[in-house]
Every structure is written in C-alpha cells, then in structure tokens.
Amino acid sequence: MLDSFTILTKGGIVLWSKEFAKIKGSPINSLIKKVLLEERSAETSFQIDSYSLKWTFSNEFDLIFVVVYQKIFTLLYIEELLTTVKKRFIKMYKDLLLKLKESSDFIIVDKFQEFNFEVILEDVENRSKLQQTSNSAPKKYEDTDKGKLVKDQKNERAIKEGRVEKVKRKEQEKKEKAERRKQNKANNINDISSDDDSDDSDSSSGSDSEENSNGATKNQQTDVARIENSGYKKKVKDTPDKQASSSTGKKARTWEDGKLSKKELEALNRSDNSNGTEIVREKIQKFNIDMDVSSSDDDDEEEAKPVSGFMKYFNVLTGNRVIDKQDLEPILADFKLHLTKKNVAPDVADKIVQSIGTGLEGKKLATFQGVTSVVKQQMEDTITRILTPKRNIDILREVQAVKGKRPYSIVFSGVNGVGKSTNLAKVCYWLTANGYKCMLAACDTFRSGAIEQLKTHADRLNVHLFERGYSKDAASVAQDAIAFAKDTGYDVVLIDTTGRMQNNEPLMKALSKLVNQNNVDLVLFVGEALVGNDGVDQLTKFDKSLSLLANTTQTHIRTIDGIILTKFDTIDDKVGAAISMVYSTGHPILFLGTGQNYTDLKRMNIKSVVKSLLH
C-alpha cells in the first residue's frame, strides 16, 4: 500500500529511506518547498500529483519522518505507523543521533541501514486489521442509519404535535380575550347611554332649538370647539403672493436627458485651457524608499530588561529542560489571541500557532539556555520565514533589463477605494526619480471620474496619460497603450484598472483578459492594511479568478505577482494583515503606502513587522 518511507534531518540529509514502488517526480522535495519552508508544518497532510504525504517531527533530534502513498487509498494506520517508527528509530540510534546533532560533520549513513522497517509495518497493519474487524460487529437497530431515521421522525412528529397544541391554546386565548373585550365595550356603551338619557331629561326642549347668529345650534358649537382644541387645522391654500415669495429660493431641476446649457458644459470641461487654471508640477527627486528601523543595539538592551508584553507568558516554562505539549497548549492559546488582536486572520493565526508548537514540542534546552529566548527565537524565525519572499522582485533591475527593447508594463488591481490610482502615482514618482520615462494608461473605463483623477496625477508628475475615454474595452486600451509606449520610447507603462469586488465575475473576467492578453510584466494587488479576513478573501479570489477565468491558449497563465499594502501609517502595531495575505498566497509585499504624499511609499522591513507583531 505504501510507496515510500523516508527519515531525514531538518538540514536535508536522508538517514534512511525505503521505496516500495517507483516514485514519479520528487514529492518529498515538493513537501519541503511548499509546506515545510513556508511554515505550514501544522498541516497534517499534503497532496501532489497522485500522491498523498504525511509526516511527523522529532524536534529533540531535528528529524522528519515522511510516508508517501497513493491518494486514492484511505490508510487508517498511517498516524500510528509514523509514531511507532519514530519511537523505535530514536530508541535504536539515540547515541548516533546525538553525535549527529552536535556535529554536522559526523555523518555515518550506513549505520542506519540496519533499521528493520518491514517488521514494524507488518505489526501496525495487523493491529489495524484486528481493530477494523472488532469494529465491524453487528450494530443495534437504534445505531443503524434506518434506526436513527425512524427515531428522528418520531421526535419530529412529537415536536409538531406539541407545536399544534401550543398554537391551538394561543388561538383559544385570543378568542377569550376578544370576547372579554366585546363584553367590556358593551357595558361601557350602556353606561354612557344611560348618562345621556338623564342629561336630556334635565334640559328643556326649547334650549335644543336655540340657534346662534350664524344659525348653528349650541351642540354644533361645542363640536367645533372640541375640534379646534384638538389641534386639527384645515390646510389653507397659499396665496399667490406667498407662493411667489417661497419659490424664489428653489433651483430648477436638471433632467438627465435634457440639453446642457453653455454654463453646464463649461463646468464639465476638464481640458488644459479650462479657466486658464495653472497646474502645480511636482519636483521629482530621489527619496529613501526603505522603512526606518531601530538599531539592532536596541535588541541587546531589551534582553537586559525584565520580560514584558506577550513574552511574559513563557516565564511559566522556566526550569523545564524539555518542552512538552502540555506546557505549550495554554501559552500557544494566548499567543493565538495575541495574533488576532494584531489583526491576523483567525484561521491564519491558528495555523501559525500550530506550526510554532510543532517546532517547539520535544525541544531540549541547553544547560544555561532560557526557555523565553528559545521560544521567542522560534516565533521570530517562523514569522520571518513567512514574510520572506520566495520570489525576489526587483522592479528597477527588471525595467533596466528590457529598457530600449520594449516598455515594462505594471497592472494595478484591487477592490474599490483602496487607493490604486494614488499608489500607481507614487510608483510612477519613484520610477521617474530613478531616471525612467513613465506613461500612465487609463484602463478604468467604468468608474465616472477615474480618467480625470488619473489626469490630475499625470499633470502634477509631468508624465503622459494614454486614454480612450469611458465604456471601452480595458484590454484593448492597455494593448494600444503598450504599443504607443513602444513606438514613442517609454520605459514603463503603469496601467490603472477598475476597482471591482472579488465575486463580480464579469469584471474579474475582464481583468483576467487584460492581464493575459497583453502578457504584462507585473500584476500587483493593492489592498488595505486595515482589513483582516476581508483582505485574505479578496487576494485569494483575485488570484484564483485571474487563472480560472482566463480565456487564452497560453501555457503560462498570469496571476498576482506582488502586493501593495496601503494606509499602513494608520494601523500602529496592528500589522496582522501583512501576515495573513502573505501566508495565504505566498505573494510578497513589495510596497507599503504610508501617507498622502508621492514620497510616502516604503519597502517593507521584515524585522520591524516581526517586532510589532510580537510586542
């Protein structure tokens, strides 16, 4: 049933391996690259091609035990096999493993070939078969699916009958209340009529026929007085003079399908010669794009101070020589809560915490090694590995590589209102300051005012804006813009796109068409640093939609290449969105938006983000 079983060190040295069938490709290398190096070791299984892989760690000796089998099979004994092999292997070669851990030069792989794996496998398989046969005893009728169904139907019938009785009782109570209300009303009417009869008998008949000067009776006068006292007033129609005075302040309605006046046309004019407005040009100059980060000496000072902040939770482990699962559980629960407070998405926080726990469990401490320092280092290493980009994107170097041959094209995508146009202008300023000739392409042909907004940036930065107006095909506009840039000698084309929700299929299909049809060099997702779960959902769905909705015959389908996080200056130390987005997709964060000026664009400093997250 198994295809292979491998025992290797965390450094990549294979100590023992056994193949039961020919393996296609390198599933273990894929596991290391896509799971272990990306801090996803908390996951229980990994599938690639036709294989399913499961693994376990021995942190005390820095070992990994990996089993590979066909994913079409459901093998119930895999977990037990991994645990048993780990215990037997460590018990059998403990001294060798200690020497290997102390010195990487001490490698005697031949010594491990004596390990008798087949005996352990046969023993585990037999125990699994016995357990399955014992579990296959006849079930009681109540435990079968049919018995459960009958039981559920009986319960539902009883609930319905109870509800019917309850409804009947309520209806009966309503009828009784209505009867009582009628009876009370009839009694009140009888009392009033008897009072009226007594009043009529006391009054003379002549008084009933008396009239006032207008011919109205006294009773009618009383009715009029009662109405006036009640506050009711008959609406009096305004006089023509009053209507004229009130209509002077009202503006005429402007109908959308009517003709525009000359004044209205002038108000809508956005051309350069409108009202002779002077354009304020930005002074382009180089600026420091790297984040400010405190000196490394501060870390040494912090070590001398008493432990505070989140790391105080680890004081409870002081004195333990080996970290076990029971020690870690309450601490990791607190750390998960700490991460969510820092705006890390809950599911991402859970996976990170599990990965940290997996890396710490069973770790043996040196004689004078503090638990706090070990745990802190493990956390820093884990989060640093998550944020470290797997693909190094150097925009300046890539632009320089194609300069003179063709323009380098960058697409800015994202949902509505995150600051795509603003950050496009910031990147344009940065590239222009580094000596490259840039052009803006207005491919947001959907939102009213988008072209005018981009034109404002183009005028201030003194760069050319390529536009074809509204209601045009964005992919065709981008294609024409890139062709125009090539003919006129531009180095970079920055393409602005329509803001769209991640579940809007027509707009996502249009974005996929733009990206894949024009074979752009870089696709950036612009997201807010303020969001947690929403940002992850937006990014993952944008990423999937670009590939799934692509209508192209190209073998290489384009997806998101990098991330720009905006409004980073508003979140203080709640930097969790950066962790969530990078962990969920593996895409690097290229820039951080830190303000409203063109120079408020920074590269992310991983050390600074880790420090904010852990304190």
From Swiss-Prot:
<feature type="region of interest" description="Disordered">
    <location>
        <begin position="131"/>
        <end position="257"/>
    </location>
</feature>
<feature type="binding site">
    <location>
        <begin position="496"/>
        <end position="500"/>
    </location>
    <ligand>
        <name>GTP</name>
    </ligand>
</feature>
<protein>
    <recommendedName>
        <fullName>Signal recognition particle receptor subunit alpha</fullName>
    </recommendedName>
</protein>
<dbReference type="InterPro" id="IPR027417">
    <property type="entry name" value="P-loop_NTPase"/>
</dbReference>
<comment type="similarity">
    <text>Belongs to the GTP-binding SRP family.</text>
</comment>
<feature type="region of interest" description="NG domain">
    <location>
        <begin position="408"/>
        <end position="614"/>
    </location>
</feature>
<dbReference type="InterPro" id="IPR013822">
    <property type="entry name" value="Signal_recog_particl_SRP54_hlx"/>
</dbReference>
<dbReference type="InterPro" id="IPR011012">
    <property type="entry name" value="Longin-like_dom_sf"/>
</dbReference>
<keyword id="KW-0675">Receptor</keyword>
<dbReference type="GO" id="GO:0006614">
    <property type="term" value="P:SRP-dependent cotranslational protein targeting to membrane"/>
</dbReference>
<dbReference type="InterPro" id="IPR003593">
    <property type="entry name" value="AAA+_ATPase"/>
</dbReference>
<feature type="compositionally biased region" description="Low complexity">
    <location>
        <begin position="203"/>
        <end position="215"/>
    </location>
</feature>
<keyword id="KW-0256">Endoplasmic reticulum</keyword>
<dbReference type="GO" id="GO:0005047">
    <property type="term" value="F:signal recognition particle binding"/>
</dbReference>
<feature type="compositionally biased region" description="Acidic residues">
    <location>
        <begin position="193"/>
        <end position="202"/>
    </location>
</feature>
<dbReference type="GO" id="GO:0005789">
    <property type="term" value="C:endoplasmic reticulum membrane"/>
</dbReference>
<dbReference type="InterPro" id="IPR000897">
    <property type="entry name" value="SRP54_GTPase_dom"/>
</dbReference>
<dbReference type="GO" id="GO:0005525">
    <property type="term" value="F:GTP binding"/>
</dbReference>
<dbReference type="GO" id="GO:0003924">
    <property type="term" value="F:GTPase activity"/>
</dbReference>
<dbReference type="Pfam" id="PF02881">
    <property type="entry name" value="SRP54_N"/>
</dbReference>
<dbReference type="GO" id="GO:0006886">
    <property type="term" value="P:intracellular protein transport"/>
</dbReference>
<dbReference type="Pfam" id="PF00448">
    <property type="entry name" value="SRP54"/>
</dbReference>
<dbReference type="GO" id="GO:0005785">
    <property type="term" value="C:signal recognition particle receptor complex"/>
</dbReference>
<dbReference type="InterPro" id="IPR036225">
    <property type="entry name" value="SRP/SRP_N"/>
</dbReference>
<dbReference type="GO" id="GO:0045047">
    <property type="term" value="P:protein targeting to ER"/>
</dbReference>
<keyword id="KW-0472">Membrane</keyword>
<feature type="binding site">
    <location>
        <begin position="414"/>
        <end position="421"/>
    </location>
    <ligand>
        <name>GTP</name>
    </ligand>
</feature>
<comment type="function">
    <text>Component of the SRP (signal recognition particle) receptor (SR). Ensures, in conjunction with the signal recognition particle, the correct targeting of the nascent secretory proteins to the endoplasmic reticulum membrane system. Forms a guanosine 5'-triphosphate (GTP)-dependent complex with the SRP subunit srp54. SRP receptor compaction and GTPase rearrangement drive SRP-mediated cotranslational protein translocation into the ER.</text>
</comment>
<dbReference type="GO" id="GO:0016887">
    <property type="term" value="F:ATP hydrolysis activity"/>
</dbReference>
<dbReference type="Pfam" id="PF04086">
    <property type="entry name" value="SRP-alpha_N"/>
</dbReference>
<feature type="compositionally biased region" description="Basic and acidic residues">
    <location>
        <begin position="139"/>
        <end position="181"/>
    </location>
</feature>
<keyword id="KW-0342">GTP-binding</keyword>
<comment type="subunit">
    <text>Heterodimer of an alpha and a beta chain.</text>
</comment>
<dbReference type="InterPro" id="IPR042101">
    <property type="entry name" value="SRP54_N_sf"/>
</dbReference>
<feature type="binding site">
    <location>
        <begin position="566"/>
        <end position="569"/>
    </location>
    <ligand>
        <name>GTP</name>
    </ligand>
</feature>
<dbReference type="InterPro" id="IPR007222">
    <property type="entry name" value="Sig_recog_particle_rcpt_asu_N"/>
</dbReference>
<keyword id="KW-0547">Nucleotide-binding</keyword>
